Amino acid sequence: VTVSENPMFLRQRLRERLKRARETAGLTQQQVADRFSWSPSKVIRIENGKIGVSVTDAMAMAEAYDLSSEERQELVELARAARRPPWFAPYKGVMTPALEAYIAYEESATIVRAFERNVMPGLFQTEEYARSLLQRIEEDRPAAAEQRVELRIRRQQILSVEETQFFFILDESVLRRTIGSSEIMRQQCETLLRVSELPNVTVYYVPFTAGAYPFFRTPYQVFTFEEGDPVAYLETTAGESLLYEHASGGDRRDPADYLDAFLQVERSGAALPISEDLLFENFTD
């Protein structure tokens, strides 16, 4: 999957374009519903993402909005692509809705910024590191643990999409905590070093001596897109959650707050480049 090809992200883009086209055409949702003998709720649910859009409906709406033949064709292709099952469909039994959305945003972003504490980011984890970690989390469900390992390794293909830029800040605890064994950690550090040398990947760490810094207690990711507002993903003791710009909720923060925190740490001098000596000093014989 390349940038912006995830079906979930395509569905979001499709409904945004349909809504924008309707507004540009000067039509109300009621007028569109009347034209096609639909209930007004159908138009509302299409535009807010409650239901999908069939290729037939996309064609009809594009015509009603007086789009050019080129714009109509783009919408039809978008509707067709948005209905394809995602590659992670076989793993849905071990995925939360938030994780499904997370992967969609991860694959569709032009810039991914991630802060991690305690454990290595999933995109960096070796198979043995991931297995050691997930077997402990899924002690009563070994089959689920193995599926989650497969899913995590499969996700890492996104790092090969060079048009997506990745920036990671790791708390030093990530580098010091042994997961599995010293041998697993040596292999993990080798992988981290190799991945950090990719042209589209930048990795920093914040040493313990830096003390407290913005939002250092909560792992988070911020996704920036070519179109639309940024989205933030948080991992807390209460579970996973997604934050959208100007959305109400218990957190009351916007993705922009997390983006600002990330950039503040990145530019403050607290975030340092990783090195081979740093990574291996704890895991040598």
What residue spans do the PLM features occupy?
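Amphipathic alpha-helical interface segments
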Residues: 2-4, 119, 124-127, 132-163, ...
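Internal helix-loop-helix
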Residues: 110-115
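Active-site-proximal binding-pocket segments
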Residues: 170
